[in-house]
Amino acid sequence: MKILLANPRGFCAGVDRAISIVERALELYQPPIYVRHEVVHNRFVVEGLKQRGAIFVEELHEVPDNNIVIFSAHGVSQAVRQEAKQRDLTVFDATCPLVTKVHMEVARASRRNMEVVLIGHAGHPEVEGTMGQYSSETGGMYLVETPADVEKLKAIVKDPSDLHYVSQTTLSVDETADVIEELRRVFPDIQGPRKDDICYATQNRQDAVRELAGDVDVMVVVGSKNSSNSTRLKELAEKLGTPGYLTDCPEDIKPEWFEGKTKVGVTAGASAPEELVNQILERIKELVGARSVDEVLGREENMFFEVPKELQIKQVD
């Protein structure tokens, strides 16, 4: 049995930054440090931070007065920011800068009273945060997930000549392209971002799966089930005809995944740490009797996002 390891894989710059913000806050200010929503969608990472004193909550009212709260990498609405300000909470913002870019596009359109279409998955925290940047009372903001949803907008959009679209950053590149194509067919005057909103890490990891899927009999994606970008990697492998499995726990891997197979592909979503990838690899090697892992060459990534200045320098009492 041969095991092929995709590149690039695992942590992106936004996830790295978000985790560093929580770690630095714990180091500088001591526990408890409150985090609104899972800072990144990975059970392994979240459990590790909990053990160090981070407390994860879903709403700000769960954060006691006079405490520190960190906003997750997925971003938050303007209403959440306003609530934190009114309560005078100390806030560190771990929103991914690439998500912030989308927020700025929506806010700009809102100020101009343009209507906005967001391509994304309902209920995802990034979508909730992005929708929450829109405040125009005369315009409107609408969520679509599939090309079929676009047709329904014809009865809702007020001014098709002044319409803008943005997208969730962790979607399937192919699926987003299909929705954009349908938007442009139904609304020929629609405007979009100068550069695709799908983030570089999402694109790169999906490209790596495309390269690898044809060379393996099964694909194991390291990531949690609530991770959008990890789920898209599994779905992409399956779309390309390769059975895919999503896991964030070595014990969940089943021997039958590999029955009758000769080549296993392994990759990891942008919120999955290399430590977990290695644990998964060891489990697969144990199950299939492989001695080594062949790492596939891929696109080099050198993106880096700084943590807030307040967390960069050790503070002296």
UniProtKB/Swiss-Prot annotation:
Disulphide connectivity of cysteines: none
A Pfam family this chain is assigned to: LYTB
Entry keywords, A to Z: 4Fe-4S, Iron, Iron-sulfur, Isoprene biosynthesis, Metal-binding, Oxidoreductase
Pathway annotation: Isoprenoid biosynthesis; dimethylallyl diphosphate biosynthesis; dimethylallyl diphosphate from (2E)-4-hydroxy-3-methylbutenyl diphosphate: step 1/1; Isoprenoid biosynthesis; isopentenyl diphosphate biosynthesis via DXP pathway; isopentenyl diphosphate from 1-deoxy-D-xylulose 5-phosphate: step 6/6
Residues annotated as binding (2E)-4-hydroxy-3-methylbut-2-enyl diphosphate: H41, H74, H124, T169, S227, S228, N229, S271
First and last residue of the signal peptide: none
Similarity comment text for this entry: Belongs to the IspH family.
Protein's job: Catalyzes the conversion of 1-hydroxy-2-methyl-2-(E)-butenyl 4-diphosphate (HMBPP) into a mixture of isopentenyl diphosphate (IPP) and dimethylallyl diphosphate (DMAPP). Acts in the terminal step of the DOXP/MEP pathway for isoprenoid precursor biosynthesis.
Protein name: 4-hydroxy-3-methylbut-2-enyl diphosphate reductase
